Amino acid sequence: MSMRLGTLKAGLALTAACLWIGMWRPAIAAPEGGNGAASGYHVIKKVTLGGEGRWDYLTIDSAARRLYLSRSSHVMVVDLETDKVVGDIPGTQGVHGIALAPELGRGFTSNGDANTSTIFDLKTLKVIGEVKTGAGPDCIIYDPASKRVFTFNGDANDATAFDAASGEVVGTVPLGGCPEYASADGQGKVYANIVSTSEVVEIDSAKLVVTKRFPLAPGLKPSGLALDAAHHLVFSGCSNKIMTVLDVSAGKVIACVPIGRWVDANGFDPGTGVAFSSNGEGTLTVARETAPGKFEAENIPTEDNAQTMALDLKTHNVYLATARFEPKSGNPQNMVKDSFMIVVVGK
């Protein structure tokens, strides 16, 4: 994939068409550890971890200082203080995501090829159980309000809910389309992107029903999702290079932020009020609301294929995963052996 650099400052109009007014300004690619962006965000470091397997979602336990990385058939665990691999969770075939329930001392994976979720101990990383899910579990989240884990099953167009403590499946939620990422607000609501219908659905995590559907037009095929729970805003990264801002209280999209190509994850930092979009073209979009419905955004150069991210709430740094690929080696391309790395962006 090619890298495209740019800086955007845009005032976003609150219209039904979600129009924006702004201009692109040339970006200066700062050297690693340098600061060439107006926002102050830049690549702090790149750490090569190597190891086998491709990757999907990342999850950070900021309190325990651990980073969890899905690696096709296993989960790699990294110490955030030393940048060293400190553990591995095997037997997670087709793993996509990792969810954590720190108060229960448990973690959970979504195993897309096995149609299961692996339960593991957060301290020892030992596997302590397995749960059968719907077909093709992709995103997985923990909802602290209901103390339930939700897997969002792309092949089944539904979500499986199970009790985080017992591992008992408590229900299935039909979603009316193929889900992508989701997030819980901590108050009993779960919000999930539906990529096939370009919507966000609201789920009651206790009743296990979809209570609302929100169209994201003009956003198309949303993948990444992040939640500003305090202000009831849902950020959805869409395939047509915009991040929609959905006000769930108002029931409508109130703004759109232009982003880079090939987004697959989003983040929101409640400590700084900054929203992020990790783009496979090799950029991280950084956006901040400057007035109601108006955002200022900037693209920070990262690395090609760095399209998933996780946020460290302690340092406010963003972690992205990527690797090198052999040129013209087919589709999909072959990864260069032991080239897997994390890219850390911060101030």
Q: What annotation goes with each model-predicted range?
A:
Residues S2-A13:
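Bacterial N-terminal signal peptides that target proteins for export
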Residues R4, C18-W20, R25-K347:
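Predominantly soluble domains enriched in secretory-pathway, periplasmic, or organellar proteins
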